[in-house]
């Protein structure tokens, strides 16, 4: 009998990680049956305000004899109750069990949980219709992700290898050799990616909190991901490693929409015209985009660093495609820019004073006429239009690795442009 197990909302800023629980159970459940595939790490809607750290849920699928089903479920519940950060006010774990094949209604629910806002009440109704068993701890908000991780149709996927720390090391600085990570990246990029930030000269595979994760290496080839890990020098004991199949770096969260159809917490791709000159507030860069159905604000926030320089080059009238998650900023619906593509740029024209026709000197404006600073020649005030280069190419611009969302697909990966500019 196939038993699908989903877990979510077990962590907090103080520690724990749902992937760690998944990796533990992947080993423990092997005494009851055979795993059908690698565990799945499913990232859900990154815009939801009460999400866990990375809004990631985990699911496991095992082929288990019916005699062991109840024992396997009891083990899962016992482990989650023991290790989840239930003391934290915002941690509300959820567990889901489904026996047999995954029904279509659960697949549709998973896609909705990826792209839109879903309530606990909706999840409970879907569980009943799908024949899934749910276990709620506290508010049990985690049942949303638990059910979605089981139902998620992982047609597009990448891999992530996670190495976990021993309990006694989790309050200490992670001891990972920086130079070895850069060397690993040189060897295996782009089959593994987002390992380092080449501009800041920092490594990105190590998180910073008290959670159990020591390093995480992402890639599109599981063999190369494993080899990449072997090339990293780690100066502390590792409890275990686990390879996950995941929807990270797939762009599956993004949906083409007209501006008039956009809702709070959506993840959208929008085609339109720049409707305003950019403005800045608090190191964030903003502009507006419009189509025939409406207008919406777009933001390149401070963590995107040099990416903001490209946004500053956009001019009113430019035709562009933008992509990102929709949140409220200063009470206004705003697309948090992940990438953009200039389709058609308006000419950039600057009006300049001519040189003096007598001596070639510089002309100075004097009300309604011009006067040469060198020879004093006067002439009517006529400015000459000069077309300036735009300094933007017809290509996709993306945020830097350390500002990238888990779900956003880096341009270095195959088919990274298909969803974004394929429909043009």
UniProtKB/Swiss-Prot annotation:
GO terms for molecular function: ATP binding; ligase activity, forming carbon-nitrogen bonds; nucleic acid binding. InterPro entries: NA-bd_OB-fold (IPR012340), NA-bd_OB_tRNA (IPR004365), TiaS (IPR053434), TiaS-like_TCKD (IPR053870), TiaS_FLD (IPR013696), tRNA_Ile2__agm2C_synt (IPR024913), Zn_ribbon_TiaS (IPR055394). Disulfide bonds: none annotated. One of its GO terms (cellular component) is cytoplasm. It is found in: Cytoplasm. Residues 268-342 bind DNA. It catalyses: cytidine(34) in tRNA(Ile2) + agmatine + ATP + H2O = 2-agmatinylcytidine(34) in tRNA(Ile2) + AMP + 2 phosphate + 2 H(+). The keyword Ligase applies. Its EC number is 6.3.4.22. Its main location: cytoplasm. CDD domains: RPA2_OBF_like (cd04482). GO terms for biological process: tRNA wobble cytosine modification. Keywords: ATP-binding, Cytoplasm, Ligase, Nucleotide-binding, tRNA processing. Belongs to the TiaS family. NCBIfam families: tRNAmod_TiaS. ATP-dependent agmatine transferase that catalyzes the formation of 2-agmatinylcytidine (agm2C) at the wobble position (C34) of tRNA(Ile2), converting the codon specificity from AUG to AUA. This is tRNA(Ile2) 2-agmatinylcytidine synthetase TiaS. It comes from Pyrococcus horikoshii (strain ATCC 700860 / DSM 12428 / JCM 9974 / NBRC 100139 / OT-3).
